[in-house]
């Protein structure tokens, strides 16, 4: 289980450029980052910066090596290959989204 105490919502200025298999660059906004004690890793969840707020967005998730400031935008990103690790990331994302929805209703 991830340690939710370390969930950090993305800052407005935290953006990461990803390059796809065709060499195309796309700018992504950091949704949030978190640390997992179980896996000993940090994770970042991203969504395309070009998406508007009223559209459903595809969220990308990676483990990352933070820079000296703990920033995901300057560190190295790594794919998540383990199914159990994916399940943990999805659980944290669902909790984050549920918390965000409840805050909107307040």
Curated annotation (Swiss-Prot):
TM segment ranges: none
Pfam families: DUF1292
Annotated InterPro entries: UPF0473
Taxonomy, superkingdom: Bacteria
Family (UniProt): Belongs to the UPF0473 family.
HAMAP family in the record: UPF0473
This protein's name: UPF0473 protein LSEI_0788
The species this protein was found in: Lacticaseibacillus paracasei (strain ATCC 334 / BCRC 17002 / CCUG 31169 / CIP 107868 / KCTC 3260 / NRRL B-441)
Taxonomic classification: Bacteria, Bacillati, Bacillota, Bacilli, Lactobacillales
